[in-house]
């Protein structure tokens, strides 16, 4: 039942998942009493039920007035976080929403979705790279955005270990280009999407994002634009995250690969991530790094076993689990500060 605290719900889920039975969640008592739903409205266990904590809920209606009638630019707007930002912002009546992405297919998908769901929205989709300063300046000259949410980045830890130059060029110089242009064009507020891997970084991707944070903090001291950063943990269900990988491996009959039996990570859902970004945009005074309280870290091995059981299999029997060792630059545990 949703009325259980996150830890209690997690304990019951752990017990039930070992029975081999299908697990469903009943509506909350308050929903039944208010007539919002009926007892027949059961739902399957969802990704956020695996977090072991209550979901973070934010009344965005109270804080998103700063978006109303503003021109908003989202870099990397076709990605997991960027596209959800587009969806949320579109609901709060911006004057214009500008999506900037190098991947045309992703940009096209979110463009079609927003035109279908928000036909009244003034929407522009622009293809290009944050590494191209001329293109960035041309974009800001054309649209004169009030707010920029900078989500464009390379984020895959192992791939960036093999291509460090690309991580620096795209993440660091891309952020520098966007920040310099934002300051030159009088943008009111600039929000950088960062990561918990920027804390005492041990890999190229984390180090590049820490440099991005330093860039925006430096720019905040030197310009009238308010520059802030938002630091995430791992995002459940995002492109390239561990859960879709596990689901594909389970669907293929295994094995499920985990780097280390004791490795832990902080997790959040995409809506939680976006609510933090939008809150940061509201509360920003300039120079801050915002961090979401994500509760206790989750053991990846436990998550893999739960997903196997929720798929109707027994871990280690029907679906083997293989531990293939920490990858270069990978930590056993992450921090937030």
Labelled PLM ranges:
Residues 35, 150, 154-213, 218-220:
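Conserved Rossmann-fold NAD(P)-dependent oxidoreductase catalytic core, especially the SDR/UDP-sugar
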Residues 126-147, 329:
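Conserved Rossmann-fold cofactor-binding substructure of NAD(P)-dependent oxidoreductases
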Residues 1-34, 102-111, 116, 123-124, ...:
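A solvent-exposed beta-alpha-beta segment
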Residues 9-71, 183:
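Flexible, Lys/Arg-rich cytosolic regulatory linkers and terminal tails that connect or flank
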């Amino acid at each position: 039942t949703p009325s259980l605290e996150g830890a209690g719900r997690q304990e019951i889920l752990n017990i039930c998942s070992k029975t081999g039975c299908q697990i469903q969640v009943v509506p909350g008592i308050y929903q039944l009493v208010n007539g919002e739903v009926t007892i027949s409205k059961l739902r399957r266990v969802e990704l956020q039920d695996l977090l072991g904590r209550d979901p973070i809920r934010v009344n965005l209606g109270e804080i998103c007035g700063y978006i109303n009638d503003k021109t908003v630019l989202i870099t990397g707007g076709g990605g997991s976080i960027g596209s959800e930002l587009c969806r949320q912002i579109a609901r709060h009546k911006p004057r214009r929403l500008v999506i900037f992405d190098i991947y045309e297919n992703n940009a096209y998908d979110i463009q079609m979705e927003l035109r279908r769901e928000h036909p009244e929205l003034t929407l522009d989709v622009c293809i290009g790279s944050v590494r191209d300063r001329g293109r960035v300046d041309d974009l800001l000259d054309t649209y004169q955005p009030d707010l920029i949410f900078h989500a464009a980045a390379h984020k895959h830890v192992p791939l960036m270990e093999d291509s460090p130059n690309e991580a620096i060029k795209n993440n660091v110089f891309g952020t520098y280009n966007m920040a310099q242009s934002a300051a030159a064009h009088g943008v009111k507020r600039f929000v950088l999407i960062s990561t918990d891997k920027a804390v005492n970084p041990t890999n190229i991707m984390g180090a590049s994002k820490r440099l991005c944070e330093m860039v925006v903090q430096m720019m905040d001291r030197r310009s009238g634009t308010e520059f802030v950063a938002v630091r995430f943990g791992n995002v459940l269900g995002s492109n390239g995250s561990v859960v879709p990988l596990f689901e594909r491996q389970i669907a293929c009959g295994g094995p499920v690969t985990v780097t280390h039996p004791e490795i832990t990570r902080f997790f959040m859902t995409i809506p939680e991530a976006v609510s933090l970004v939008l809150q940061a945009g509201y509360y920003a005074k300039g120079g801050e790094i915002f961090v979401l309280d994500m509760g206790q870290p989750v053991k990846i091995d436990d998550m893999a076993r739960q997903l196997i059981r929720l798929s109707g299999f027994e871990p280690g029997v029907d679906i083997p689990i293989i531990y293939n060792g920490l990858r270069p630059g990978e930590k056993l545990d992450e921090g937030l500060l």
